[in-house]
Curated annotation (Swiss-Prot):
Gene Ontology terms: cellular component: cytoplasm
GO biological process, one term: tRNA modification
Gene3D superfamilies reported in the protein's UniProt record: 1.20.59.20, HUPs
Record keywords, A-Z: ATP-binding, Cytoplasm, Ligase, Nucleotide-binding, tRNA processing
EC number(s) per entry: 6.3.4.19
EC class name: ligase
Organism: Buchnera aphidicola subsp. Acyrthosiphon pisum (strain APS) (Acyrthosiphon pisum symbiotic bacterium)
Protein name per Swiss-Prot or TrEMBL: tRNA(Ile)-lysidine synthase
Catalytic activity: cytidine(34) in tRNA(Ile2) + L-lysine + ATP = lysidine(34) in tRNA(Ile2) + AMP + diphosphate + H(+)
GO MF term set: ATP binding; tRNA(Ile)-lysidine synthase activity
Role summary: Ligates lysine onto the cytidine present at position 34 of the AUA codon-specific tRNA(Ile) that contains the anticodon CAU, in an ATP-dependent manner. Cytidine is converted to lysidine, thus changing the amino acid specificity of the tRNA from methionine to isoleucine.
């Protein structure tokens, strides 16, 4: 399998995730054998999780093996203070972030995952109630940001790797924390799978076959959905759900899942997807429901679903802008306001007026070009500003006089004895959601 990988990839530069255990040790030595016949570049990376007093000793073992074999080794340390909630997931995320930062653009990350690991992952997904995508578990090749992870041993059992390692008289680390069945993966590995294998000797390979079938069916489903989803995605990346009430629920939820898949986030649970379907499709047309997904939200506005990053409320924020300052930085990464010649023409402040920026206003407003005051909520609606953006737009005040929602509208005030000033709002918000803004 490794020879096939060497011939398949032109760059032939590999970074081995080297724990010092059986799997990664076999992987490292397999590559060394191939290096005798083919030109390849090998580096290794060892992550010390600092979970045991032996951690330092394991790092030294990895250094020794790599020094003997002239393999450049990177050693990094992880220290997690809170070792209670979801420790395995926290370590995995930190580990892969570190590895990604060390991975060269022309390198492929190789890991020693085998059939046993695949079966464990399958059972963990089963425990979570996953569908075909989750039950697909690991694939031979996975996109890793802009790079790749390849798992050459995914068809091999742990016994096969162990047999080869003993034959070659290799030395590897035995991590006895793997026997601690308080961790779900260890429980499956040590308590569940041995019983199943004892009953059915072919269980592991059939479990692996199931993951391959799930992968194939997931690819087919995604191909099917891809053709339909791009007809529903608008230019602002929102999802048009206007006709979802006339489509079967299974198709609707599949389209929602695929749309979220394109956002490159951790896939929401079945429960969350069903919640999005019920609340977004069947709530009142004038309501604006939201579902929170970690640091993001799914919101509905005018028969479209929007995926947005949750922003802290600016309701009580008040910023003072000194008249001598050309630029004012805004909170929440909203960019900055600047006095220049490319923005909105506004009435200037009087000598005794303080310039201040707020993000909340309630009441009636008379905007330029109109003859009657209207509730500001109605103006936001008219300008197609969705609710979650309304308290992110800088509102310009002179003392307590409302002057402008920068870049959206200007308030009609008496201009007597006022000079003119030009202010522009430089930010990513308008460029990514420019369909919501009408500029004067």
């Amino acid at each position: 399998m490794i020879k096939e990988i060497i011939s398949q990839y032109q760059n032939k530069s590999f970074l081995v995730a080297y724990s010092g255990g059986l799997d990664s040790t076999v992987l490292l030595y397999k590559l060394l054998e191939i290096k005798k016949k083919y030109y390849i570049k090998i580096r290794a990376i060892h992550i010390n999780h600092n979970l045991t007093l032996l951690s330092k000793k394991w790092s030294e073992h990895c250094k020794k093996i790599c020094n003997i074999n002239h393999i450049p080794l990177i050693v990094e340390n992880i220290n997690i203070k809170n070792k209670t909630n979801n420790l395995e997931e926290k370590l995995r995320i930190k580990r892969y972030n570190i590895i990604y930062n060390h991975l060269f653009s022309d390198e492929i990350l190789l890991t020693g995952h085998h059939i046993n690991d695949q079966c464990e992952t399958f059972f963990l997904s089963l425990k979570r109630g996953s569908g075909p995508t989750g039950l697909s578990s690991m694939s031979f090749e996975t996109l890793f940001g802009t790079k790749k992870i390849v798992r050459p041993f995914l068809k091999k059992t742990k016994i096969e790797l162990q047999t080869w390692a003993k034959k070659k008289k290799l030395h590897w680390i035995e991590d006895f924390s793997n026997l601690n069945i308080d961790y779900d993966r260890n429980f499956i590995r040590n308590e569940v799978i041995p019983i199943l294998e004892k009953r059915w000797s072919y269980f592991l390979k059939n479990c692996f076959r199931t993951t391959i079938i799930c992968q194939q069916e997931t690819r087919l489903l995604n191909d099917f959905l891809r053709e339909r989803i791009y007809k529903l995605i608008k230019f602002d990346d929102s999802l048009n759900i206007e006709n979802f009430k006339n489509i079967k629920q299974a198709m609707c939820t599949a389209l929602i899942r695929y749309w979220l898949l394109l956002k490159k986030i951790k896939m929401p649970s079945y429960k969350n997807i069903q919640c999005i379907y019920r609340q977004m499709i069947f709530s009142r047309i004038d309501s604006n429901p939201k579902i929170i997904l970690g640091k993001h939200e799914v919101r509905r506005y005018k028969q479209s679903l929007h995926f947005i990053k949750t922003q802290p409320s600016l309701k009580n924020t008040l910023l003072f802008w000194h008249k001598n300052n050309i630029k004012l930085t805004l909170p929440n990464n909203l960019g900055y306001l600047i006095k220049n010649n490319n923005g909105t023409v506004l009435p200037g402040p009087k000598e005794n007026e303080l310039i201040n920026i707020r993000f909340q206003y309630e009441g009636y407003v008379l905007i330029l070009g109109r003859s009657k005051k209207r509730k500001i909520k109605k103006i936001w609606q008219e300008k197609n500003i969705p609710p979650w953006l309304r308290n992110q737009i800088p509102l310009l005040f002179y003392n307590n006089y409302f002057i402008s929602a920068i870049g959206v509208f200007v308030v009609n005030i008496k201009n007597k004895n006022r000079t003119k000033c030009i202010i522009s709002w430089q930010n990513d918000l308008k460029s990514t959601t420019n369909n919501f803004f009408s500029f004067y």
